[in-house]
């Protein structure tokens, strides 16, 4: 699948990554209750996707980022993996045009990839397998619940 980041020309996109420039009015109008989560991800998508539904978002490959802090979180940890799953669920549940079926297919693939990494590391594979299967079951149940997506995040990520 094509990523706008690979474009050599100015192009429209549905969302922009975190290293983006925004009109001050968009940034000032952004409302999201602070969530005291230990790990947060997808803020760029959660912020920019709704704007992209109403306004034209452009990617300009001529604009270059000079410096970006390195991510310090252990992306292989269970906490980070669970956070990514719940934030993806939040995004899908807050954007009804998103497909739950595609979300599940993605979740299955990500879960299998996590298990493959765990198996290759040969450390705690069975406890990891139990963890991700339990997490997947929770994600499925929450997907069909009428629970408020923000409340799901608050309960699962604090």
Regions found by a protein language model. Give the residues of each.
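Structured helix-beta-strand junction loops
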Residues: 30, 53-54
């Amino acid at each position: 699948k094509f990523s706008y980041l690979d474009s050599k020309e100015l192009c429209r996109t549905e969302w922009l990554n975190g290293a983006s420039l925004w009109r001050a009015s968009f940034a000032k109008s952004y409302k999201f209750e602070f969530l005291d989560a230990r790990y947060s991800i997808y803020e760029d998508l959660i912020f920019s996707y709704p704007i992209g539904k109403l306004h034209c978002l452009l990617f300009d490959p001529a604009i270059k980022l000079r410096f970006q802090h390195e991510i310090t979180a252990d992306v292989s940890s269970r906490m980070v993996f669970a956070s990514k799953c719940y934030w993806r669920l939040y995004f899908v549940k807050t954007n009804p045009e998103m497909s739950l079926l595609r979300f599940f297919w993605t979740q299955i693939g990500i879960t299998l990839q996590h298990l493959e990494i765990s198996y290759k590391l040969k450390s705690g594979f069975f406890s990891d397998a139990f963890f991700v299967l339990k997490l997947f079951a929770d994600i499925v149940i929450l997907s069909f619940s009428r629970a408020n997506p923000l409340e799901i995040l608050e309960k699962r990520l604090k």
